[in-house]
Amino acid sequence: MHGLMLAGLLALPLSVLGHPTESHSSGISRRAIDITSYRLPQISKYTKSDAVPKQDGESFTTSSTGNDNSSSGDYVTTATNWLKKTLPKATYRLVKDHYIGDSGIGHVHFRQTAHGIDIDNTDFNVNIGRDGKVFSFGNSFYDGEIPKANPMVKRDFSDPVNALHGAIQILNLPVTAKPENVKAKPVEGKENFKFEGTSGALSDPKAQLVYLQKDGGLVLSWKVETDVGDNWLLTYVDANKNDKVHSVVDYVSAAEYQVYPWGINDPTEGNRTTLHLPWLKTLSTDWHIDGKGWYSTTRGNNAIAQENPTGGPEYENNYRPKSPLFIFKYPYSKAMTPPSSYRDASITQLFYTTNVYHDVLYILGFNEKAGNFQINNWNKGGVGGDYAILNSQDGSGVNNANFATPPDGQPGRMRMYTWNASIPERDGCFEAGIVIHEYTHGVSNRLTGGPENSRCLAALESGGMGEGWSDFFATAIRLKPGDTRVTDYTMGEWASNRPNGIRKYRYSTSLTTNPHMYVDADGLTSVHAIGNIWASMLYELLWNLIDKHGKGDVTKIRPVLKNGVPTDGRHLAMKIVLDGMALQPCLPNFVQARDAILDADKNLTQGSNKCEIWKAFAKRGLGVGAVFNLSKRTGSNELPAGC
């Protein structure tokens, strides 16, 4: 689950709340099941740009392919040939989510196969540079012996319905699947099914026969998909022993408008104002049209926002404010109670913040090809049909928020809760940092490993970076004109009613205020705690680039780019962090993500910010000599020569 924090923490004494270090998430954990014990192993390798072997022969220019992702005699062929050369004995398939990003890098993803069956946690991503040659690549392919027996010949595996029952029983899922009612209906693909006749899940469960790389070998498994709201799970059930689960992935991480405008993080920072046509006009449409019609409510191409007091799965027919004149102005004050009395204002604020963030990210490169959230992709690549479902005042929980990120083409889902640590209780929709944090989970999951692969942040350190990226973007966006590198920021301070926020340390460039170092991740099992470390490093990066390039006008929404490069340090930091997500391998660690950010800057600015980036990471122990080991990391403050 990619929630903002732990709902259970707010029940603890305030002295404990000041320094939360462990997660007590809702959902599965309420049923006494710890799904974190089923995490995928972290086995990816990343070959950064300056370590790629020299390439001879012809190349093509990625920019010459334009927006056409269907052309095959180009970067896809180059990537395929590189895989063949690197791993000549491997069998694999091309994932269909390849694209050329707006930074000129072609991103191509492959999945390893055995006997025509996916090895589900094996990925090979190749990044093709502007010169048409391999820029960098990541690899988690299995290099051991492939089972000689083809399971499709003897068909010595269990029925998918039995696997569904196994997942339900082992994880204690709130799904009913009576044997006499459940039918496994074949869908496109080998041994791929959708279950009909179940109840309790938000959509029909699914199952696909796959191999899983585990403990140095391959295990044949049923990948069972169940969306139960607070958890949207991929459960890898042994294909011969349905009482055994090998691994679990959770997709969930949580006109005219009167709103707190962009840059105002919460009601303590400013007042609500009326904004006229706030969308960024360089984009193709406004927020209330999707190519099929206009919606005089909080619905459009990028998002659909509504209240959800029951916490149920339905959303299309839920209440949302309507205005034939597109005037969304509704009363709200911090003293109003109960939250339902200002639901119109809450839904409008959530719709506004999410749409602005969508537009900013679009300019920075998170567009249709990269797997963004839109119903209509306007023939610009990617898969449409996937706006963000935004639930205001969701009744399925309190003191939290989460975001579910299925693969491209399926809607993301944000659940925003109320917070009861103050009187009156507070609505998380009015704290922009929470909304941005949650939406960023959708961004990092779509970019890492490619838009069609939403399990690439499922390892512990990868998931921690997911939380860190979310905190980083929320913090970078709330900067004020007078801020300097000595300015500190919290996360979730207003909603939680806690002056120090919901993280162990504030985001600060002071090692006294925030002493976090890379090796502090040793022994941590909470993704939020690990994320606090990663975001602390990115906060150093942010200020190093601002000190070099300036903040720009933080009162303006639109990033200013010149030749595709942001002109200010704030948006430049955001841009290279986004680009780094697309470059890094599936299931990355801190060292690999650092190298991908350096590579992103190398591609975007020819490495002109190399030293600023290295100094940010080295300051907090992720220097040249840093080494990842899950139980015992090696820290380093060393800088490369020339820095």
UniProtKB/Swiss-Prot annotation:
The active site is at E438. GO terms for cellular component: extracellular region. The keyword Ribonucleoprotein does not apply. It is found in: Secreted. PANTHER family: EXTRACELLULAR METALLOPROTEINASE MEP. PROSITE patterns: ZINC_PROTEASE. Induction: Expression is strongly increased during growth on protein-rich medium. Expressed at even higher levels when keratin is present in the protein-rich medium. Its EC number is 3.4.24.-. Residues 47-73 are annotated as: Disordered. InterPro entries: FTP_domain, Fungal_virulence_M36, Peptidase_M36, Peptidase_M4/M1_CTD_sf. Binds 1 zinc ion per subunit. Secreted metalloproteinase probably acting as a virulence factor. It comes from Trichophyton rubrum (Athlete's foot fungus). Residues 19-254 form a propeptide. Its main location: secreted. This is Extracellular metalloproteinase 4. Zn(2+) binds at H437, H441. Belongs to the peptidase M36 family. Residues 1-18 form the signal peptide. Residues 47-57 have a biased composition (Basic and acidic residues). Residues 61-73 have a biased composition (Low complexity). Its cofactor is Zn(2+). Glycans are attached at N271, N420, N603, N629. One of its GO terms (biological process) is proteolysis. GO terms for molecular function: metalloendopeptidase activity; zinc ion binding. It comes from the Eukaryota. Keywords: Glycoprotein, Hydrolase, Metal-binding, Metalloprotease, Protease, Secreted, Signal, Virulence, Zinc, Zymogen.
